[in-house]
């Protein structure tokens, strides 16, 4: 991992109880993949009433089917209804709540105190999990929610391991869930970190300096100031930013904040992604019973690799085995902004950000295909092509249990005609595989 960190404390090799591995389900395919690759449970958003409304890959009918499918696999599904509702949405929310409750999900992820109280009154048999959006950071708040009837707290990402342990010690009779992997938000609504970042005054503690309202100057390292001409529309001005530019605020002109820009945007606060796979024993020791992976908008490949890596790490930990670095290496092949352990071991400060790799650091491998079916008689697998594949190239077949290297010898279209090359987005192809991949598998190829 690229971050310079203090040494990570590993627990002893004594056998540890196995926590829940909770994966995101952005759509039906990702749900099935997550469960196949090792998730104990998944979470999905209810259309219109969760915080990923625009990216939800479920409709009401498919979400009900997802609940049924998950239960048939002997696993759990939690449904997010964690909006903070305005008056206009309350009646609709309650109607949808009644429909969802009839499906008997294993829990509802909620934030709004009033809606939580109504849900507990209308459907007391369905566990309520308090969303991380509720910003739970201390044991007194956990105590309050437990007394109200909430069964699980999804902890704020800003907590240190020691703080989690104290919460568990003082309120032991409630489940604690913690994020272990995925993107990290800098701010949510009024819960802003800009003042803390720029002026060391925490808005969440009542000391906001309104840093977002300050006047800022854009400066080049040679000392010149760029004057941006105002236009009729604030969206019409775009200036490419080369290396060496900084932002400063007149009252703190000596403090220069570097700006980096690539083809995907300009980054003032670009958090690294969370990866706490090496801290799982410490999180269990602190009282966490569910490890949550962020990423409902990520790909099925992301769901597969995070599920498999954390499943293996949890199983090793539960069996008393030391941490296997191969689990982290697999995560490093995913697209990310490089990794940080967040606040679990310290305040990350500048090490929590990554400007050099603003968009994707997972460049060593690319996904070339997703398995759609397998014919045992011919040993041929039908794949959706995601990226260019060529015969005689070296590929890896990724299954829930194995990584199988092989040389691509035979590839054909669905008519049985031989192919030398297949391109992403084209029609599906059939490939001769070294073994039966099972129901779910991917192909990947090294890019170096």
Q: What name fits each language-model region?
A:
Residues 2-10, 14-36, 41-48, 66-67, ...:
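Surface-exposed amphipathic alpha-helical tracts and adjacent flexible/coil segments at the periphery
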Residues 53-69:
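Glycine-rich, positively charged N-terminal anion/phosphate-binding segment
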Residues 54, 132-136, 155, 301:
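Alpha-helix capping and helix-loop boundary segments enriched in small/acidic/polar residues
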Residues 91, 125, 130-137:
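Gly/Gly-Pro- and Ser/Thr-rich, intrinsically disordered tail segments characteristic of DNA damage-repair
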Residues 114-115:
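Alpha-helix capping/helix-boundary segments
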């Amino acid at each position: 991992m690229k971050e310079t960190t203090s040494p990570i404390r590993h627990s002893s090799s004594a056998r540890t109880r196995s926590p829940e591995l909770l994966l995101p389900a952005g759509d039906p395919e990702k749900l099935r993949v997550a469960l196949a690759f090792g998730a104990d449970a998944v979470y999905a958003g209810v259309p219109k009433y969760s915080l990923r409304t625009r990216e939800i890959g479920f409709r009401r009918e498919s979400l009900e089917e997802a609940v049924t499918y998950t239960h048939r696999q002997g696993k759990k599904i939690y449904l997010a209804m964690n909006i903070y509702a305005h008056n206009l949405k309350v009646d609709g929310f309650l109607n949808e709540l009644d429909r969802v409750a009839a499906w008997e999900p294993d829990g509802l992820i909620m934030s709004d105190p009033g809606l939580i109280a109504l849900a507990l009154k209308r459907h007391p048999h369905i566990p309520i999990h308090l969303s991380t959006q509720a910003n739970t950071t201390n044991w007194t708040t956990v105590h309050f929610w437990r007394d109200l009837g909430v069964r699980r707290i999804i902890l704020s990402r800003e907590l240190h391991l020691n703080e989690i342990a104290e919460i568990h010690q003082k309120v032991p009779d409630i489940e604690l869930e913690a994020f272990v992997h995925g993107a990290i938000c800098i701010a949510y609504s009024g819960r802003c970190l800009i003042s803390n970042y720029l002026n060391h005054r925490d808005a969440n503690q009542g000391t906001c300096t309104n840093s977002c309202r300050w006047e800022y100057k854009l400066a080049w390292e040679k000392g010149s100031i760029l004057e941006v001409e105002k236009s009729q529309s604030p969206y019409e001005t775009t200036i490419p930013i080369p290396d060496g530019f900084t932002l400063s605020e007149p009252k703190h002109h000596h403090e220069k904040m570097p700006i980096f820009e690539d083809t995907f945007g300009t980054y003032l606060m670009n958090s690294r992604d969370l990866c706490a796979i090496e801290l799982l024993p410490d999180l269990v020791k602190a009282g966490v019973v569910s490890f949550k992976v962020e990423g409902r908008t990520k790909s099925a490949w992301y769901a597969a690799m995070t599920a498999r890596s954390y499943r293996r790490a949890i199983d090793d930990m539960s069996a008393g085995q030391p941490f296997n670095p191969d689990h982290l290496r697999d995560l490093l092949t995913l697209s990310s902004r490089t990794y940080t352990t967040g606040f679990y071991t310290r305040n990350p400060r500048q090490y929590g950000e990554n400007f050099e790799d603003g968009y994707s650091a997972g460049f060593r491998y690319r996904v070339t295909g997703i398995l759609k079916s397998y014919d045992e008689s011919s040993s041929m697998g039908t794949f959706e092509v995601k990226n260019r594949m060529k015969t005689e190239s070296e590929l890896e077949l990724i299954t829930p249990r194995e990584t199988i290297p092989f040389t691509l010898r035979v590839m054909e279209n669905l008519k049985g005609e031989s192919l030398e090359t297949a391109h992403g987005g084209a029609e599906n192809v059939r490939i001769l595989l070294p073994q039966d991949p099972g129901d779910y598998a991917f192909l990947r190829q090294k890019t170096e």
